[in-house]
């Protein structure tokens, strides 16, 4: 279980969250929905320790770890896909996949097919549409087989089917 407690976020005089809490069960789909500009993306940044809060994973405090161990925790347990997916521009999607394979991640043929990854492998991120970038980023995140997958994306049929 992942819990965030006592999350407070303000920008200037505007308070977005005051003493907010959140709980999500691993292996379950949890959806945060709201209007554009309502703070969904800001709230999701708390999962990356971008804000001060109490952060518990399986009952253990993570927010009190030193920076190096927090980063290890994030890498070992979380994968995040941002609204604007992040890629290394000089690498094709296939090169991104190969880099993950070098780190021990495995291809997932079912997701590869469902997300339409094969036709994207020889393309550079800058040549992809927004939807193609999102699908590629989701696939790369899934290759890591995270316990917690955070998707700050617009849903499309191909992503919803996974």
Question: Language-model segments: which ranges?
Answer:
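Q-loop/switch helix immediately C-terminal to the Walker
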Residues: 84, 90-103
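Conserved ABC ATPase signature
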Residues: 124-128, 132
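Hydrophobic anchor residue at the start of the ABC signature
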Residues: 138
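Helix-to-loop junction immediately C-terminal to a conserved catalytic motif
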Residues: 48
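The feature captures the beta-strand-to-loop junction immediately N-terminal to the Walker
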Residues: 33-35
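Conserved ABC ATPase "signature" region
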Residues: 105-120
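ABC ATPase NBD coupling module
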Residues: 62-79
């Amino acid at each position: 279980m992942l819990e965030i407690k006592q999350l407070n976020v303000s920008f200037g005089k505007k308070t977005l969250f005051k003493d907010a809490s959140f709980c999500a069960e691993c292996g379950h789909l949890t959806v945060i929905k709201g209007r554009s500009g309502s703070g969904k993306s800001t709230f999701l940044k708390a999962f990356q320790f971008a804000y001060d809060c109490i952060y518990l994973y399986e009952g253990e405090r993570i927010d009190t770890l030193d920076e190096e161990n927090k980063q290890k925790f994030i890498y070992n347990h979380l994968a995040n896909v941002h609204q604007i997916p992040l890629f290394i521009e000089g690498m094709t999607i296939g090169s991104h996949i190969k880099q993950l394979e070098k780190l021990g991640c495995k291809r997932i043929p079912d997701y590869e097919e469902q997300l339409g990854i094969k036709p994207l492998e020889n393309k550079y991120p800058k040549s992809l549409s927004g939807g193609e970038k999102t699908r590629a980023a989701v696939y790369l995140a899934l290759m890591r087989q995270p316990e917690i997958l955070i998707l700050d994306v617009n849903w499309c049929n191909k992503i919803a089917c996974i």
